[in-house]
């Protein structure tokens, strides 16, 4: 698996198409929404995770003060994916940690998509984050009307 840093001119369409067909992508992950915040003081460091030329996941994020964080232009961000197994989520997280170390980033803060927005309920990523030493620093409540 490999990580490619998002580039607007090359990846806009494939990013948005993946979000639309993903299990947990929302308007907050769409590039049009994230681009609205382009004049803010952060480096958009969104990432695309490929496995054999196929997108495995996206990560909408930014770098501020040597920290990779969920995109500050959205209420939540983090990983966007289709089907996710426990092992696949561990592999993605390990690759993200390795990427951060190689790029001199010393902290990762993720605000995951609330489960209410998932097409199919799946806690593999959140469990893997916990299992790999990530800590919950904040809780948010989400609800919706159908």
Where are these regions (language model features)?
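Short amphipathic alpha-helix that is part of the acyltransferase structural core
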Residues: 1-31
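Exposed alpha-helical structural elements
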Residues: 13-14, 32, 95, 124
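Structured loops at beta-to-helix junctions and adjacent beta-edge loops in soluble globular domains
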Residues: 6-7, 62, 82, 113, ...
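Generic structural signal for residues positioned in beta-strands
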Residues: 2, 46, 78, 109, ...
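A generic fold-level signal
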Residues: 10, 41-42, 137-138
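Acyl-donor-binding surface of acyltransferase catalytic domains
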Residues: 88-146
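Residues that cap or initiate secondary-structure elements
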Residues: 9-10, 53, 85, 116
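Conserved donor-binding loop and adjoining core beta-sheet/short helix segment
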Residues: 17, 34-100
């Amino acid at each position: 698996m490999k990580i490619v840093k998002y580039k607007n001119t090359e990846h806009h369409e494939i990013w948005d198409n993946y979000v639309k067909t993903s299990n947990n992508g929302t308007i907050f992950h769409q590039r049009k929404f994230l681009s609205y915040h382009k004049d803010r003081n952060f480096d958009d460091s969104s990432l695309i995770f490929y496995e054999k030329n196929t997108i495995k996941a996206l990560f909408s994020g930014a770098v501020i003060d040597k920290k990779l964080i969920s995109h500050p232009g959205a209420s939540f961000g983090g990983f966007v994916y289709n089907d996710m197994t426990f092992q696949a989520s561990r592999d993605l997280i390990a690759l993200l940690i390795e990427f951060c170390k190689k790029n001199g980033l010393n902290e990762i803060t993720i605000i995951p998509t609330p489960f209410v927005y998932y097409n199919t309920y799946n806690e593999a990523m959140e469990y893997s984050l916990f299992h790999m030493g990530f800590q919950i620093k904040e809780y948010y409540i989400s609800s919706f009307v159908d």
